[in-house]
Amino acid sequence: LDFQFWIHNLQIPESVDLLVIGYGSTLRCDDSVGLRVADTIEAMNLPGVHTLTCNLLTPELAETISQASRVVFVDAAVDAEGEIQLRELVPAKSSQIFAHAAEPGTLLAMARDLYGRAPRAWCLAIPVDNLQIGEELSEKAQRGLTLAVEIIRKLAE
């Protein structure tokens, strides 16, 4: 497999109220659910909403995050108890990253520390079953995708 880091749609328009960041791997079945949610939202062309997809959360996202009024991070959650979870985030105390990928709270701290602003943000965790190599979504992930799109649509109103 030829694995490369990528971010799609990094530049955002000036008037973005809601930034939706879907992340995960297209190679691992349900792990792609965050990406698919963002792609579905993008196709809806909701006013004031911009989507961004990436395989990992990295420091390059901090500037883009600082430019949005609100941000929703969308990801697969293996340990979720069967229910989709929307939880409000706060910036981490430190903006330092000690691994190859960042957590949403760390990116919010980086946006605050480097660009002077951390927007209101949430993590939307979608319960999943299957992280094997492949492209199919499980029924559980598909149900979560549908519900996640509805939650984001309501946030965008």
Please report, for each region that a protein language model flagged, where it lies by residue:
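N-terminal catalytic or cofactor-binding beta/alpha core of small enzyme domains
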Residues: 6, 10-128, 135-147, 151-157
